[in-house]
Structures are given as C-alpha cells and as structure tokens.
Amino acid sequence: MMKMSEENLEVPFEFGECHAHIFMDGKNYKKAVERHKNGVDESVIRSHFACYQTQGIHFVRDGGDALGVSRRAKELAPEYGIDYRTPIFAIHKNGHYGKIVGKGFDTLKEYTALVKEVKTQGGDFIKIMTTGIMDFDTDGGITGEALRVQEVKEMVHIAH
C-alpha cells in the first residue's frame, strides 16, 4: 500500500484499473491482436503488470478477450500482488458490437452455452454487450443497434 504525506498526515491509498483489456496496448488494436494470434504472448501481460506495480495499482478489472489473454493474466496476477478479475471473454449477439473482446451468439441456447463456458474457464463475472460504443461524431450517440430490453432481461436471468 502506498502512502502520501500532507502536513505530516499519512493517508493510505491504493489504485485500481476498472476497465482494462490486458491484450490491448493502447496504440494499435490490430498489432495487439497479432501479438497473441499464435498463442498468448505472456511478455505483454508481464509488462502491463510490472507497470501497474510501479504505479501502485493493486486491482484490475479486465473486460475480457477472445484470445485467452485475460485467462492467462488471471493466473499470473498473484505474482505481482494484483487482484485481477475477468469475465475471460465478453458475450455479444452476433451482428452487434462486441466481437473485438469476446464471443458471439445467435440464439439464447448459444448464449447459455457461452455463460457456462465462462464459468468453466474460471470467469469472475459475466460481461454482456448490450449496446454499441459512444460515437463522438454524433454528439454522444451510440454506434450500432442496442439489444431489446426483454432480450437483455432474459440474458441477465440466464447468467444468474
């Protein structure tokens, strides 16, 4: 735990990263994916974790990926004193936003199988993609089409 001093007052604090994708590098998505194409490049994970350590980050909530990187990161995190939580991969409806960080489904039966797969692989939570992402070119609009409310309710019910 890091401490800062202000007028002889010791204030303990820890930092957390609450929206990470350990497989990405913040520079070039395609190159980041390419690094893990033939298997997880553990050096990328270790580099991120070493950086987190130096910055006092002890908690990471990852959004998952379809490459197995966050699954491996979950195994390595304790070596760095990091509490790492991941859904392993996000779940999206095919044809909607989410392909870059997860696996898709067409039917609720397929969705149910993906929920079971997350649990089998040791996921800490279920991440479902229900909308697109913010489109800053349209003053805060959302890209793509959101899922229907009833469908989202059923997905949440299945996940529980």
What are these regions (language model features)?
Residues 1-12:
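Histidine-rich, glycine-flanked metal-binding segment
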Residues 37-38, 63, 104, 142-145:
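A generic secondary-structure micro-motif detector
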Residues 109-160:
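Histidine/acidic residue-rich metal-binding segments in metalloenzymes
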Residues 97-105:
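Short, surface-exposed amphipathic charged segments that create phosphate/polyanion-binding patches used
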Residues 10-76, 97, 150:
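Metal-associated gating/positioning segment near the N- to mid-region
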Residues 41-49, 105-119:
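Short, acidic/polar
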Residues 70-84, 143-153:
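Short, electropositive alpha-helical surface patch
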Residues 44-71, 81-92, 123-137:
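Divalent metal-dependent hydrolysis catalytic cores, especially in the metallo-beta-lactamase
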